[in-house]
A protein has these predicted regions:
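Aromatic-rich, lipid-facing transmembrane alpha helices and their immediate juxtamembrane interface loops
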Residues: 1-255
Length: 255
């Protein structure tokens, strides 16, 4: 049980550090506060899983810097690709996109990013982990296994809430796509008129769709996803670009 408690504490600490890194980096880049993370709480589990994978599979080779670097980069890249693929299949959405980064693979991973992760993992193993290990030992000595148990409960409830919330989001964007598809049929019947009139009619149809079907449908967590993930791409959704624009409009107007 003590070993499991150690793993849970390490997972939480590195998940928090990952969330802190992403939040600070993205906030500076966007010049505004950006609350990152798939879950509600201040942690990004992908970082926890990534660092734990490195610590338990690659750290034994820490004296061989090349193996440590390459092994870390490969492990984290595989995890990033699998996570991206899984989220897309589950929720019909892509949370990050590396298509504009050189040497990318399906926009899910990219060589420059992987090389950066490799450097980060070397820094963690050589410099950060020895200090984190001291913190974990202190926490275990102070709180026993209770802190780890609380972390599991809180993150578990957070995960359940987020999954339910994302299922609602998936249902909403699917409904949006289908509704816009229906409205397009009405729009096509007007193409024999002047283009500017048809365009104006299409804008009215979209506005009517927004007001009649989708106002007040986005909750706080869903607005956060749209606001803090500008590269969020909808997959396998009818009229995905129009749905994305509609989501932005609803979010900006607080509806």
């Amino acid at each position: 049980m003590e070993k499991m408690s150690q793993v849970i504490l390490l997972f939480f600490i590195y998940s928090f550090i990952g969330w802190l890194w992403e939040t600070v980096y993205c906030s500076l880049k966007a010049k505004k506060f950006v609350y990152r993370g798939f879950l509600v709480g201040p942690y990004c589990p992908i970082y926890g899983f990534g660092v734990l994978s490195v610590l338990y599979f690659v750290e034994p080779f820490e004296n061989n810097l090349l193996v440590l670097y390459v092994g870390s980069a490969v492990l984290v890249t595989i995890l990033e690709y699998v996570t991206s693929y899984g989220l897309e299949k589950l929720f019909h959405a892509s949370w990050w996109d590396y298509h504009d980064v050189p040497f990318n693979l399906n926009g899910r991973v990219a060589l420059p990013v992987s090389l950066f992760w490799g450097l980060g993992c070397v820094l963690i193993v050589k410099v950060i982990q020895p200090e984190i290990a001291k913190v974990v030992s202190f926490l275990q000595a102070t709180f026993g296994n209770y802190l780890a148990l609380c972390i599991v409960i809180v993150m578990g409830l957070d995960l359940i809430y987020t999954l339910l919330n994302m299922q609602g989001f998936k249902k909403l964007i699917t409904e949006m796509g289908q509704t816009l598809e229906t409205n397009q049929q009405e729009f096509k019947q007007r193409l024999n008129t002047k283009m500017e009139i048809a365009t104006a009619d299409w804008q009215k149809l979209k506005e009517r769709t927004k007001k009649e079907h989708f106002q007040n449908r986005l909750n706080f967590q869903q607005r956060r996803f749209i606001n803090n993930y500008p590269k969020l791409t909808l997959k396998n959704i009818k009229n995905s670009k129009e749905v994305r624009h509609l989501l932005e409009d609803l979010k900006n107007k607080g509806q």
